[in-house]
Amino acid sequence: MRPFGDFTDNLPCEIPADGIFLSAMTPTFTKLFEFAKSRYNPREVSPLIQAGEVSAAILTKSGNIYTGVCIDTASTLGMCAERNAIANMLTNGESKIDKLVCYMRDENGNDMAGSPCGACREYLMQLDADSGDIEILADLATGRTVRLRELIPDWWGERYMKAAKR
């Protein structure tokens, strides 16, 4: 199953219908941003569960895009958008991520890119020996990206991943 079809930088990058176009971002990150934004849908699922306040889109090394939304609960059983996107990816037999966008809105309702929380950073790092290379959109206005290893330096599991890679 190819959830959103093949995806490459060679695809044309058109101005979205709502007029938002961030020329500072690469066509790949622009498309990932639009996928993540399209999943943004904050709503109350029940008196104890809210969903969709953050959405995420990941691009795998094979060119597929998987998305997810956060699920916040009254207990500690919630799940971040990034981990839900990863669960969708793993469900479809993939495990290698190339790029990640976390979408949310600020207090004024403006679009913004978010950084994965500490739990998501850890989860991402444990996926693959090369996960430190995952490129993450850090700043929507400038299109600045960071590598996951910059967000979790001196990661404790590095030696285990290197040993398994041999």
Model-inferred region functions:
Residues D6-N10:
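Intrinsic-disorder-associated, low-complexity terminal segments enriched in Asp/Asn/His/Tyr and depleted
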Residues Q50-T60:
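Short beta-strand scaffold segments in enzyme catalytic cores
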Residues A81-C102:
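Short, solvent-exposed cationic patches
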Residues T26-S46, S95-R166:
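C-terminal binding/interaction regions
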Residues E53, V69-T76, R83-N84:
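Conserved mixed alpha/beta catalytic, RNA-binding, or beta-rich assembly cores of soluble enzyme
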Residues N64-I65:
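Hydrophobic "anchor" residues
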